[in-house]
Structures are given as structure tokens and as C-alpha cells.
Curated annotation (Swiss-Prot):
Catalytic center residues: E217 (proton donor)
Keywords for this protein: Acetylation, Cell adhesion, Cell junction, Cell membrane, Cytoplasm, Cytoplasmic vesicle, Hydrolase, Lysosome, Membrane, Metal-binding, Nucleotide metabolism, Pharmaceutical, Zinc
InterPro entries listed in its UniProt record: A/AMP_deam_AS, A_deaminase, A_deaminase_dom, Ado/ade_deaminase, Metal_Hydrolase
SUPFAM superfamilies xrefs: Metallo-dependent hydrolases (SSF51556)
Residues that coordinate or bind Zn(2+): H15, H17, H214, D295
Name of the top EC class for this enzyme: hydrolase
Protein name as annotated: Adenosine deaminase
Species name: Bos taurus (Bovine)
Highest taxon above the source species: Eukaryota
GO BP terms: adenosine catabolic process; cell adhesion; hypoxanthine salvage; inosine biosynthetic process; negative regulation of adenosine receptor signaling pathway; nucleotide metabolic process; purine ribonucleoside monophosphate biosynthetic process; T cell activation
């Protein structure tokens, strides 16, 4: 029997990776079609090999992508299809608005140096990847009734890609793209300050491109500080280690910084140690501005309900808190103000709450 959802009302998700949210069936289909060897023959076997049941180190987690990304990257049909199927997945999660992120370069096999996943050079450029993802998302939006926007990721270990990422954000800003992100291994010393990333984020500020950064997931509070002060981020991906620096934490609370929290992910990646209080409990108790997100549901064998069940059953989260955090997620989304107001009105109505005059103030 299916589990009753922990929060059976419309939800907003702001932190989920497209390449970590692919159906195993789709991976197998393109592996076979393209003659690319995969470590399993059935969706169930593949899910178990790619998926995680217990915490792994960051390198072990990242190695999961090596199993299946060669089946998808460099293939136009596959790139568009995973975007379309992503929207279907989110409709099943009860999500009404989602921002999905990905690195265009990691799905390309042309005009990208180095070519990822040991692919031979082909003719799918990062620019065309964005166009294909946009098409898939827009078709999914139409068919499944979920509003979707996208975020393009710079990669910490590849600062040479970042200038193109911000230019693609500008080029496709009218077609789903709303922001830039910095993802990858934040333990790479000084990677927030690599000139390629700093210049791209400065250009984003100048051009009015919204900004988020993975920081303080496994990295220190100092990485968070760099994201806020140097990269001028508007939101933090994870941000858990902010709590190590009380001055920084209090400042970010006052500035109403939004934390994109991924509870189940944080357990499986070792970002959170289960014998300690989860940072999201502190965020809840302090009434901080945060959201709940899946991060990489394919690898974590999860749905958005997994994160809601975890916080409800193990951390005492209430329906009122779930409403509050989703309203804050909507307010912290990268939608233009008129669309943000529409989203908020939808949530207030669904939650049986009066709609305040202004959507500016977070709860």
C-alpha cells in the first residue's frame, strides 16, 4: 500500500539536479540504442547499482554519475526526453513550481574542453543542450501542469566553462533559464575565488541574472562567506556549515538568506552526521528562510515525500511548518514578481491561508 504523503498539498522545490533525476528505464533505453555498456540489464538492477542506501564519501557519490551519464550525454533525443520526464516526475511529487539545475557542458560532446564522460567528440554543444532542455521542460510544463524554470551550473573544477554559462543564462533568460549556480566539489581549495567563477558571477550581477551557490554542504562556513560576499549569491545550496560561524549565521538570518535544504541527501552524502542535530531543526526553531528539496532523487532512491517524511517523523515537523517553508520557497524563487505573486496566491488558497497584501516579507 502506498504511504500517505507527509504533506499532501502543493509544494515548491528549488534544489534538484536534472542529471540526478533521470528514470532508470530511460538510461537503459539510450544505453541500448547507442551501444553504450551499462552495469545492469533491468531498471531495478540499475537503480540498485546507481542508488545509495547508506552514506558514501563524496568521490563514491560522484562515481555514480560515471555509470549512466555516458548513455545520455551527447544525445539530443535523450537530453530533451530527460527534461520532459523530469516534469512528469515532479507532477507526481505534488510540486506546482520547480527550479531544476544542470551543467550544460556535462551533457555536451562538442565545444567543451575536456569532453566529459570519456565521450568521443560529437556535435552537441552546451548552447544546444540548453535549447533542448528548454524544449523538454516547456513541453512537460504544458502536458503535466507544473511550472518549471531552470538554473545553469558552473562547475568548481572547470572555471574555464563559467563565462559561457553566464552568457547562456543571458541568452535563454526568456526560455526557462532564471539563474546561475556553482556546483561540484567545494573542498577544492579556494574554488569559490577562481577568477573564472568570480568574473561569471560579477557578470551575472551586472546583467540581472539571479544567483545561487552550493556552499557549506561539506565545505566550511568560510565557503559560505565567499559565496555571499564575493559571488553575491542570493540563495545557498545546502548551507549547513553556516552554523559553525555564529556571526555569519546571525547576519544571514537578518538578511533573510534562503537555504536550499536537502535532508535525505545530507544523510547519504555524509554532509550531516546522524548523531548530531540536523541543521534544518535549527533553521525551523529559528524560523529561518529555507526549503526542502530532493537534490538527486535517482541516486538517493527518493521522492520529495522522502524528505518530508524524514522531517515529519524524525524531527517533529508540522503541517504549519511545511506551509511556512513552501511559502518562503515561493518568495525566494527566481520568478519575476508578478509570477511569484500568482504562485503565492495559489499556495495561500491551497493552504487555506489569507493572502497578505505584500509578497515581500518572508514568514
Amino acid at each position: 500500500m502506498a504511504q500517505t504523503p507527509a504533506f499532501n498539498k502543493p509544494k515548491v522545490e528549488l534544489h534538484v539536479h536534472l542529471d540526478g533525476a533521470i528514470k532508470p528505464e530511460t538510461i537503459l533505453y539510450y544505453g541500448r540504442k547507442r551501444g553504450i555498456a551499462l552495469p545492469a540489464d533491468t531498471p531495478e538492477e540499475l537503480q540498485n547499482i546507481i542508488g545509495m542506501d547508506k552514506p558514501l564519501s563524496l568521490p563514491e557519490f560522484l562515481a555514480k554519475f560515471d555509470y549512466y551519464m555516458p548513455a545520455i550525454a551527447g544525445c539530443r533525443e535523450a537530453v530533451k526526453r530527460i527534461a520532459y520526464e523530469f516534469v512528469e516526475m515532479k507532477a507526481k511529487d505534488g510540486v506546482v513550481y520547480v527550479e531544476v539545475r544542470y551543467s550544460p557542458h556535462l551533457l555536451a560532446n562538442s565545444k567543451v574542453e575536456p569532453i566529459p564522460w570519456n565521450q568521443a567528440e560529437g556535435d552537441l554543444t552546451p548552447d544546444e543542450v540548453v535549447s533542448l532542455v528548454n524544449q523538454g521542460l516547456q513541453e512537460g510544463e504544458r502536458d503535466f501542469g507544473v511550472k518549471v524554470r531552470s538554473i545553469l551550473c558552473c562547475m568548481r573544477h572547470q572555471p574555464s566553462w563559467s563565462s559561457e554559462v553566464v552568457e547562456l543564462c543571458k541568452k535563454y533568460r526568456e526560455q526557462t533559464v532564471v539563474a546561475i549556480d556553482l556546483a561540484g566539489d567545494e573542498t577544492i581549495e579556494g574554488s569559490s575565488l577562481f577568477p573564472g567563477h568570480v568574473k561569471a558571477y560579477a557578470e551575472a550581477v551586472k546583467s540581472g541574472v539571479h544567483r545561487t551557490v552550493h556552499a557549506g554542504e561539506v565545505g566550511s562556513a568560510n565557503v559560505v562567506k565567499e559565496a555571499v560576499d564575493t559571488l553575491k549569491t542570493e540563495r545557498l545550496g545546502h548551507g549547513y556549515h553556516t552554523l559553525e560561524d555564529a556571526t555569519l549565521y546571525n547576519r544571514l538570518r537578518q538578511e533573510n538568506m534562503h537555504f536550499e535544504v536537502c535532508p535525505w541527501s545530507s544523510y547519504l552524502t555524509g554532509a550531516w552526521k546522524p548523531d548530531t542535530e540536523h541543521p534544518v531543526v535549527r533553521f525551523k526553531n529559528d524560523q529561518v528562510n529555507y526549503s526542502l528539496n530532493t537534490d538527486d532523487p535517482l541516486i538517493f532512491k527518493s521522492t520529495l515525500d522522502t524528505d518530508y517524511q524524514m522531517t515529519k517523523n524524525e524531527m517533529g515537523f508540522t503541517e504549519e511548518e511545511f506551509k511556512r517553508l513552501n511559502i518562503n520557497a515561493a518568495k525566494s524563487s527566481f520568478l519575476p514578481e508578478d509570477e511569484k505573486k500568482e504562485l503565492l496566491d495559489l499556495l495561500y488558497k491551497a493552504y487555506g491561508m489569507p493572502s497578505p497584501a505584500s509578497a515581500e516579507q518572508c514568514l
